[in-house]
Amino acid sequence: KPIKIKNGYLIIKLNNKRVTTNKLIREFPCTLIHNNTFSFANASPDFRRKLLDRSIFIAENNFSKTWFTFYRTLKQRNTLLKNNRISDIYTWNKKLSNDGTLLNIFRKDFFKHTLDEFNFLVDLLNTSDFFAFFGTIKIHFYQGWNDDCSFLDILSNNYKKDLLRKTTIAGPHKSDIKFLINNIDARQILSRGEQKIFSVLWSCAQHRVLKKKYNIDATLIIDDVKSELDDRIFNVLIDLLNHINNQVIFSCIDDCFSS
C-alpha cells in the first residue's frame, strides 16, 4: 500500500520506498485555496507566515533545513530565558542570528516575487473596476524586527526585555505581511468580500511564482470553490484560472459548471 498508518504514524511509499513528507511535497507539489485561505488578510500573522513558508518549502531545497534549525534554536533560547541561564544565552544568539537571517532572506525574496505577480494579476483582470481599494492598498513584508538593525544586534539590544518576558520578542517568528490603506490597517477598512478577492489573488500570485521563477508545475487545489464566494468574486476566480498554466483540481458542492 502506498499510504498506510502504522503505530499511529502515517507511512508513505513512493516506488515501494518509504519517503518523507518533504520528499513527497517536492515530487507532487501543490498549493491549496480553501475556506481559511479566503480569510488570509484577516488571519493571524502565524497563518500568513505558514502560507508563505509552504510555497518556499516547495521552491527552495535548503529552506526546510533552515526553517527547522531556526525554530529548534529559538526554542532552546526561550528555555534558557525561562530558566535564567544568562551565561548561555550569548552563545545561542549567534546561531539564532545566522539561521534567522537566512530564513528572512528566503521569505523576503519570495514575497517580492509574489507581490510582482499579484500586481500583474490585478492589472490583468481590471479588478479595480469594481474593487477600488486595489488602487490604494500597500503591501509590506515585516521581517519581525527593525529594518535598520541586524538580527544579532536586536537580540543583544532586547536582552533585558527578553529576560523579563521569558521569551524572544523579535525575529523571523514575528514576521508578517501587512496591508495598509492610507497608513491604516486594511482589515479595518475592507469588507468581507474585498478581503476574499484579495486573498484569492494573493494565493494565485504565490502559485504563479512557483511556475515563473522556479519552473515548478504545482497543482492548484481549490476546496469547496463556491461556498465562501459570491457570484462576483467567483467569476473573478474563474477568470484567474485562465492564467494558471498548471493542473487545477477543485471541489464544488453546487453545480456551477453545467452547460
PLM region spans:
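Conserved NTPase motor "head" modules and their coupling/switch loops across ABC/AAA+ ATPases, GTPases
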Residues: S87-T219, E228-R232, V236-Q247, C256-S258
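Conserved D-loop beta-strand region of ABC ATPase nucleotide-binding domains
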Residues: S251
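Nucleotide-state sensing region of NTPase/ATPase domains
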Residues: K1-F47, D53-F63, N119, S156-K160
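An accessory alpha-helical subdomain
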Residues: I33, S39-N126, Y142
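Structural motif
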Residues: L32, T219-I221
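Conserved nucleotide-binding/hydrolysis micro-motifs of P-loop NTPases
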Residues: K6-N7, T37-F38, G144-N146, D254-F257
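Walker B catalytic acidic pair
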Residues: D223-V225
